[in-house]
């Protein structure tokens, strides 16, 4: 059936019992118009033109919609949208049933003409609808009916008054700051003021639906207004921040507002907060995420926080996710939304099992300019939202000056999310009253638009005059509301003591961070670990594991039934995870190929080779008290790491791990590392214990499969803000994971960066006997046995470099050389190394050996520490690659030559 025939078959066009015959004739007509009688040719030709008109209105009506408060663009090549364009007229259309326009119009309108007038008004009004790109027929049909069925936001007079007051507070706040703190940056909301009522409407609808957790992410534009009027941060606190006095004196004592602060702090328009309120019988938690100036980067963080609020992790097996528990609202800028790739990465998570949040509400605060850049230079598309079409989501463009239309857009969006659990994008089309910031003069670069913007009335005035004309309020009441806002702001301002300046020049980190990550000293019996291991190697009856894989897994019995059996890296991880789950700490591990492991080592999710069904052994740990969640991530780094960071911030009990496919690719997440993971606590008091597994080692695989850029993480390390390790022992890995898990949801929690192994995953030197797992704890340095009075040279190395040196030394033993594995690079184990060196009376030389070039790796970081330890007592030497622009050689054979030379030179004892 053709689309045109389908439209006719769905439309009650008074064909009655002859519908089937008429449809067949219509098909004949479409193939050859002369094949049907002349009277039907006329009818079918008219119907065909009507359907094309209708289709054009639905598909292109947005191009003529009244969505621009000021400076409407000049459209070129707008498709035909008028009745006359299709050789139709009023009389002809009045003779056709309204059902031909749309089946749901049949009982509403008398004829096609009346229905088309309604469609024109609807699709060319203050909301421009884009949904015909959606592939799902059910979703598209639902939107069509919802949009075309007569509907108007019905606000009674009291609600209209309340809405006007809300706008008066929004604009009055900006005007007060503009007048009293001249030139101070605040990134005003003016021009898209309706954002605040839209957020309030969303939160109210969510409360009525029982959604208890609202997660909001936004950049700096309008943020202060959202803080004060959505999270209800007191005016006194906000004005205090402009006056550089202590705002915390005005924090509500009832606990309804939670604000955290770091010791170095951040600018006021980056800060977030959490508001708790009882609304319509629902105790809601409304969170505005802290955010850096890197536009849009908070989007995946908000998604992760939302998913954490939706997941039940305090149970055995996998988490259960209830999308009704929480919802994300992400506020974008019109220049940044199409300009920043993080948005596409984040939207791609929307329907994935491991990341879905049941639909995000995206609001573009579209002031039609990015700093000084106008749309013609900012994007290659008609709208900034066009990039969202690829994700099959509806897009509503709404005039920011029509407040009631903005409310309606929210209503439809929330209904769609509830029905389909998918994202919706609302493009709030307004303008920017001032420059990018309040010190900027926009007329320097954008003189013509700003001539009109300066003449344009504010939405407060536009809506106020509308209510005056409707008789809802009087002119005097309108001005009285506006004056009342200024009075309240002045009263708040007067409460602040100008002399009460904040004085904290030292900005000391909290005492809880004075120490490194503390070892977890819990011991386990042999039988306990054997019980866990047996459970992990027990599968459902009839489950068919690939024979080749089964042989690998069966070897994991050997540490418990053979004297020389060793626990390799992957098995150590499985045992650690299982004991952590028994302790009641949930684990979430994601990354590209993480279920199996890039290097085919983990096998956390098994696949039946005959049916394809999966089985996850870590869902079946004896006495398991928390969930294990593992997902192969999409081929994304930034959004996935941001998601895991957000998840862990929201659920601090969760042991979140992101694993890079290769550590080399982690730098795609550098913004998350720089602006969130390593600095969030110092800036915002926001704690995270996210763990990174970054495969790192030089194995002849070239410059893009060798280095996780260890040097960059060490550069970010300060104030005990993280733990950075490069391990050489599977048992130390076991104890490290347990220590990290034990620190979660405490003041001691911090990120953990693991330079994880590749070839060492199966190296017997790294594998350890089971008795190293039953007791002890994480060791920051490791050494072999030695005779102190024979050692003249100490070699400090880390990770695979240590193992290479150890294996080389085993071939040519030299008691004068002592190898020391620096397992924990940050915090640097000064005390442990100093104590070791003090035991060596004949020591002459200390050498640092690394795989990486001299300007990379750990050398530049460790040098100041080692220099102090060596002082004038010993010689200090470096062995490693020379300074290089690229991390590693491209040719495997050249790699071997260079690597062997480093080892040879390092082991020479002069």
Curated annotation (Swiss-Prot):
Domain of life: Bacteria
Keywords annotated in UniProt: Glycolysis, Oxidoreductase, Thiamine pyrophosphate
Cofactor(s) in the UniProt record: thiamine diphosphate
Catalytic activity: N(6)-[(R)-lipoyl]-L-lysyl-[protein] + 2-oxoglutarate + H(+) = N(6)-[(R)-S(8)-succinyldihydrolipoyl]-L-lysyl-[protein] + CO2
SUPFAM superfamilies listed in its UniProt record: Thiamin diphosphate-binding fold (THDP-binding)
Gene Ontology biological process terms in this record: glycolytic process; tricarboxylic acid cycle
Gene3D superfamilies named among the record's database cross-references: 3.40.50.12470, 3.40.50.970, Multifunctional 2-oxoglutarate metabolism enzyme, C-terminal domain (3.40.50.11610), TPP helical domain (1.10.287.1150)
E.C. code: 1.2.4.2
Stored Pfam families: E1_dh, OxoGdeHyase_C, Transket_pyr
Any one annotated GO CC term: cytosol
Residues making up the signal peptide according to the UniProt record: none
One MF term in the entry's GO annotations: thiamine pyrophosphate binding
Similarity remark: Belongs to the alpha-ketoglutarate dehydrogenase family.
Function: E1 component of the 2-oxoglutarate dehydrogenase (OGDH) complex which catalyzes the decarboxylation of 2-oxoglutarate, the first step in the conversion of 2-oxoglutarate to succinyl-CoA and CO(2).
HAMAP family hit by this protein: SucA_OdhA
Binding partners and assembly: Homodimer. Part of the 2-oxoglutarate dehydrogenase (OGDH) complex composed of E1 (2-oxoglutarate dehydrogenase), E2 (dihydrolipoamide succinyltransferase) and E3 (dihydrolipoamide dehydrogenase); the complex contains multiple copies of the three enzymatic components (E1, E2 and E3).
Name listed for the protein in its UniProt record: 2-oxoglutarate dehydrogenase E1 component
Organism: Staphylococcus aureus (strain N315)
Lineage: Bacteria, Bacillati, Bacillota, Bacilli, Bacillales
């Amino acid at each position: 059936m053709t689309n045109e025939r389908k439209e006719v078959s769905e439309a009650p066009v008074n064909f009655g019992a002859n519908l089937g015959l008429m449809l067949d004739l219509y098909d004949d007509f479409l193939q050859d118009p002369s094949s049907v009688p002349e009277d039907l040719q006329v009818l079918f030709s008219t119907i065909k033109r009507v359907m094309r008109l209708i289709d054009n209105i639905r598909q292109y009506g947005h191009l003529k919609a009244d969505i621009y408060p000021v400076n409407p663009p000049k459209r070129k090549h707008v498709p035909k949208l008028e009745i006359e364009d299709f050789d139709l007229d009023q009389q002809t259309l009045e003779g056709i049933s309204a059902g031909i326009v749309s089946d749901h119009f049949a009982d509403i309108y008398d004829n096609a003409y009346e229905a088309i007038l309604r469609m024109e008004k609807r699709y060319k009004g203050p909301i421009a609808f884009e949904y015909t790109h959606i592939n799902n027929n059910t979703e598209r049909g639902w939107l069509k009916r919802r949009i075309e069925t007569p509907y108007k936001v019905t606000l009674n007079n009291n609600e209209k008054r309340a809405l006007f007051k809300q706008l008066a507070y929004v604009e009055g706040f900006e005007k007060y700051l503009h007048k009293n703190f001249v030139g101070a940056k605040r990134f005003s909301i003016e021009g898209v003021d309706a954002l605040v009522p839209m957020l309030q409407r969303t939160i109210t609808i969510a409360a009525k639906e029982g959604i208890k957790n609202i997660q909001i992410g936004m950049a700096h534009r309008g943020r202060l207004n959202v803080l004060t009027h959505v999270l209800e941060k007191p005016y006194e606190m906000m004005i205090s921040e402009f006056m550089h006095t202590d705002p915390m004196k005005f924090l509500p004592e009832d606990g309804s507002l939670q604000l955290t602060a770091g010791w170095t702090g951040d600018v006021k328009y980056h800060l977030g907060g959490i508001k708790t309120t009882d609304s319509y019988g629902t105790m809601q938690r409304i969170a505005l995420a802290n955010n850096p100036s890197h536009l849009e980067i908070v989007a995946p963080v908000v998604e992760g926080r939302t998913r954490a609020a939706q997941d039940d992790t305090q149970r055995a097996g996998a988490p259960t996710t209830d999308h009704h528990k929480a919802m994300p609202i992400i506020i974008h800028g019109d220049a940044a939304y199409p300009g920043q790739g993080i948005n596409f990465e984040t939207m791609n998570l929307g329907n994935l099992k491991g990341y879905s949040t049941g639909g995000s509400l995206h609001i573009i605060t579209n002031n039609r300019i990015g700093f000084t850049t106008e749309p013609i230079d900012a994007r290659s598309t008609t709208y900034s939202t066009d990039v969202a079409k690829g994700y099959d989501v509806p897009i509503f463009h709404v005039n920011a000056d029509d407040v009631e239309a903005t409310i309606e857009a929210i209503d439809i969006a929330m209904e769609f999310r509830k029905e389909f659990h998918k994202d919706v994008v609302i493009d709030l089309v307004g303008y920017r009253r001032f420059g990018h910031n309040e010190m900027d003069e926009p007329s320097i670069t954008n003189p013509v638009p700003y001539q009109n913007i300066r003449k344009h009335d504010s939405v407060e005035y536009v809506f106020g005059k509308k209510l005056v004309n409707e008789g809802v309020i009087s002119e005097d009441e309108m001005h009285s509301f506006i004056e009342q806002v200024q009075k309240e702001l002045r009263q708040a301002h007067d409460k602040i003591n100008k002399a009460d300046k904040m004085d904290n020049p030292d900005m000391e980190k909290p005492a809880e961070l004075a120490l490194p990550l503390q070892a977890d000293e819990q011991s386990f019996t042999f039988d306990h670990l054997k019980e866990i291991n047996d459970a992990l190697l027990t599968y459902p009856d009839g489950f068919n594991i690939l024979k080749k894989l089964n042989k690998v897994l069966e070897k994991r019995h050997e540490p418990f039934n053979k004297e020389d059996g060793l626990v390799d890296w992957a098995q150590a991880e499985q045992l650690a995870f299982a004991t952590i789950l028994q302790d009641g700490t949930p684990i979430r591990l994601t990354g590209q190929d993480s279920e199996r492991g890039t290097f085919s080592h983990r096998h956390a999710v098994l696949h039946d080779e005959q049916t394809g069904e999966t089985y996850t052994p870590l869902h079946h740990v004896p006495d398991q008290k928390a969930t294990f969640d593992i997902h192969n991530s999409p081929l994304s780094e930034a959004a996935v790491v941001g998601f895991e960071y957000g998840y862990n911030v929201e659920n601090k009990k969760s042991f979140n791990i992101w694993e890079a496919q290769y550590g080399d690719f982690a730098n795609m997440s550098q913004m998350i590392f720089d602006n969130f993971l390593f600095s969030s606590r110092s800036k915002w008091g926001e704690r995270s214990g996210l763990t990174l597994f970054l495969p790192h080692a030089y194995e002849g695989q070239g410059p893009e499969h060798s280095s996780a850029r260890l040097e960059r993480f060490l550069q970010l390390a300060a104030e005990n803000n993280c733990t950075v390790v490069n391990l050489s022992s599977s048992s130390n890995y076991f104890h490290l994971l347990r220590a990290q898990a034990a620190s979660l949801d405490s003041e001691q929690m911090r990120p953990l960066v693991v330079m994880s192994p590749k070839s060492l995953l199966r190296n017997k030197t790294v594998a350890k006997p089971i008795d190293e797992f039953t007791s002890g704890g994480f060791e920051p340095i490791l050494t072999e046995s030695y005779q102190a009075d024979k050692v003249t040279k100490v070699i400090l190395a880390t990770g695979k470099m240590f193992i290479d040196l150890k294996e080389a030394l085993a071939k040519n033993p030299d008691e004068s050389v002592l190898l020391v594995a620096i397992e924990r690079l940050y915090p640097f184990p000064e005390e442990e190394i100093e104590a070791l060196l003090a035991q060596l009376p004949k020591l002459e030389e200390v050498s640092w050996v690394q795989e990486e070039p001299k300007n990379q790796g750990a050398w530049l970081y460790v040098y100041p520490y080692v220099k102090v330890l060596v002082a004038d007592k010993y010689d200090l030497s470096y062995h490693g690659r020379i300074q290089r622009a690229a991390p590693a050689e491209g040719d495997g054979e050249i790699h071997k030559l260079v690597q062997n030379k480093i080892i040879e030179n390092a082991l020479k004892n002069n």
